[in-house]
Amino acid sequence: VSSDTYCTKEHDSLKISNGKWHWFSRQTGGKTALDYLVKVKGCSFMEAMEIIHGAPLPRTIPAPVSRAESKRLLLPERNGNADTVIRYLKGRGIHDVIIRYCLENNLLFESRKYHSAVFLGYDKDGVPRYGNVRGTVGDYKGELSGSDKHYSFSIPGSSQTVHVFESAIDALSYATLELFEGKNWHEDHLLSLAGVFVTKREDVVPVALSRYLADHPEIQTLRLHLDNDAVGRGAVSGIVGGLRDRYEIWDEPPKCGKDVNDQLKIRVGLKKKEEYSR
């Protein structure tokens, strides 16, 4: 076009001058050969680099994406003793034998700062992965930071039966009732679901139960002791719908009161019997 301006045969509106180029019909331009090859020739970045380099570039294999690391459970500092927690649980009707068992097997401890009851859940390798916190004053309920609900509080047994509860306190309440009956309260597995939720589906199995069954393939029978309310009844329907083809399932809600702890407190005289007893 002139002594310092050039154009190409393919694109007469593309002008090149002093190391820069501009494609007027496309309203685009650039300063480098890489820009030109990508924007004008339609090369990929790697193709353009190979042309500039004059030889194929070595191909690299992307490093495999690792699975997200397991959540790290943040445990609070333990108190020097568990006197407050013991007193609180006894006030809920739970027998001292059951409380001591949990303390001695690191299933339960008292936090130093708030003197709360901390119920721990472990994975199959014995690593704590879940922590349920219950305030000993007031109605506080919560979970430790980093808790994984797949590994909620449980007391493993030696039989082929697991008893399922909504909370750790319900599980300990059931163990106490079994103790009162003179039974071996830790022969069967006891599992807390760490709460349940409302769902419209009829085959939803809580993750804590799914994980526990996967880790304990010997289990053949489920006995459900969920609450006497709409949420508890709905959770039972979900479990039955999702597992009835693989397990023998018994629905055994509390005989009186809203939950198993209510049933225990009524049994030991800490609470009056509710009108909706069943």
Task: Pin down the residues of each PLM region.
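TOPRIM fold recognition
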Residues: 178-278
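Basic, glycine-enriched DNA-binding surface that flanks or lies within the catalytic cores of DNA
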Residues: 9, 65-156
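Conserved mixed alpha/beta catalytic, RNA-binding, or beta-rich assembly cores of soluble enzyme
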Residues: 164-169, 195-198
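Short secondary-structure junctions
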Residues: 1-5, 97, 249-251
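Short active-site oxyanion
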Residues: 158-162, 221-222
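Short active-site loop/helix that positions an aromatic residue
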Residues: 39, 171, 175-180
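Terminal peptide-recognition signature
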Residues: 23, 37, 89, 119, ...
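Non-catalytic accessory segments of DNA primases and related replication-initiation nucleases
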Residues: 1-90
